[in-house]
């Protein structure tokens, strides 16, 4: 059966209200998730939140962004406090819950390209620093998942690894600190190994890598051990769809970002018809649409709470319609 979920971000600063909305909309036949509320400021953003999970590595917020430091400062403590609040509210909102429940973390290459070293360059330029970051993230994820399992013992946790920075790391498009140069591209084999280390830290839990770029390195992702890929399908051309077909045929599931975040009044057919047409065009059987999870095209933080509810509800309705299409 096709089902719906979300990318992760949600508008506003009230995590209790956000969790209530997510559970109401998705717990029946969708995949609910721990919403992220970046409007709360530093530490609630994707990089700060991800850096806060790192084991034995301290970060703090500097004018250039998050940077490794010798000991955690005020911003790192704020990050920890925000996560603690979210986990406490999650435990209350999902008390007695049994089923799948998704959490999101920033991926190793997005973190390595966004967290700065002491000397004022991105971590990704330093092989040793990148290796330490990956190991730290893997250990931090293990600890995080153990805590989540204790808080919501009836949940089967799904881990979404957000890698918006992966294409830039692979293409050598990241600017240096001076802005006059570009950082050398990371070898795809090295990138796959780094992702694999983090994915393995999730154990036997279902994992999905989310990347909302137009050129997602699907062959690389197929070699990481991930169970699914999450894409903004509106950005995919015919060549990319051929790679999607190869990915699905290799056994990975597709999370299709089909609901535009401005589509609060769209019809279900407007959402699923382009997906079904592309699916057919690459020779995939309609019956395999049951392996597709439908999501908004990206996070919902830029909407109003009412708008976020509308977009998320449309994804739920579209997933039900897609299930009917798969059985036709």
Segments the model singles out, each with a brief description of its role:
Residues 227-328:
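Catalytic-face loop-and-helix region of soluble metabolic enzyme cores
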Residues 1-130, 220-227, 252, 290, ...:
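Alpha/beta catalytic barrel-like cores
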Residues 118-133, 160-184, 257-264, 295-304:
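Active-site-proximal beta-alpha loop/turn segments in soluble metabolic enzymes
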Residues 75-92, 131-146, 269-275:
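Glycine-rich anion/phosphate-binding loops
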Residues 34-37, 102-106, 160-162, 208-212, ...:
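A cross-family glycoside hydrolase active-site/sugar-binding cleft signature
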Residues 21-22, 218-221, 239-247:
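A short acidic, amphipathic alpha-helical/loop segment
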Residues 90-93, 144-148, 191-201, 240-245, ...:
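Structured alpha-helical segments in the cores of large, soluble enzyme domains
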Residues 136, 140-236:
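Active-site loop segments of alpha/beta catalytic cores
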């Amino acid at each position: 059966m096709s089902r719906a979920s979300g990318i992760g971000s949600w508008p506003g600063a009230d995590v209790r209200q956000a969790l209530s909305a997510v559970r109401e909309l998705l717990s029946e036949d969708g995949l609910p998730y721990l919403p992220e509320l970046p409007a709360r400021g530093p530490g609630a953003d994707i990089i700060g939140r991800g850096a806060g999970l790192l084991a034995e590595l301290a970060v703090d917020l500097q004018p250039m962004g998050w940077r490794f430091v010798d000991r955690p400062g005020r911003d790192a403590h704020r990050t920890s406090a925000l996560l603690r609040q979210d986990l406490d509210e999650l435990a209350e909102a999902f008390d007695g819950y049994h089923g799948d429940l998704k959490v999101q973390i920033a991926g190793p290459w997005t973190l390595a390209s966004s967290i700065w070293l002491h000397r004022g360059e991105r971590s990704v330029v330093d092989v040793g620093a990148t290796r330490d970051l990956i190991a730290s993230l893997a250990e931090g994820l293990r600890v995080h998942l153990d805590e989540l399992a204790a808080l919501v013992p009836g949940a089967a946790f799904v881990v979404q690894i957000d890698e918006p920075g992966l294409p830039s790391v692979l293409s050598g498009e990241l600017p240096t600190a001076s802005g006059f140069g570009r950082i050398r591209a990371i070898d795809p084999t090295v990138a796959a190994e780094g992702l694999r280390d983090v994915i393995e830290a999730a154990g036997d839990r279902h994992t999905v890598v989310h990347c909302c770029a137009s050129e997602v390195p699907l062959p690389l992702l197929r070699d990481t051990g991930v169970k699914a890929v999450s894409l903004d399908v509106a950005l995919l051309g015919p060549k990319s769809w051929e790679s999607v077909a190869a990915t699905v045929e290799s056994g990975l599931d597709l999370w299709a970002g089909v609901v535009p975040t401005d589509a609060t009044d769209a019809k279900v057919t407007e959402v699923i018809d382009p997906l079904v047409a592309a699916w057919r065009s690459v020779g995939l059987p309609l019956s395999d649409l049951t392996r597709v999870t439908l999501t908004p095209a990206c996070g919902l933080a830029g909407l109003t709470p009412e708008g976020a509810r509308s977009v998320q509800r449309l994804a739920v309705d579209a997933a039900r319609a897609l299930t009917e299409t798969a059985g036709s």
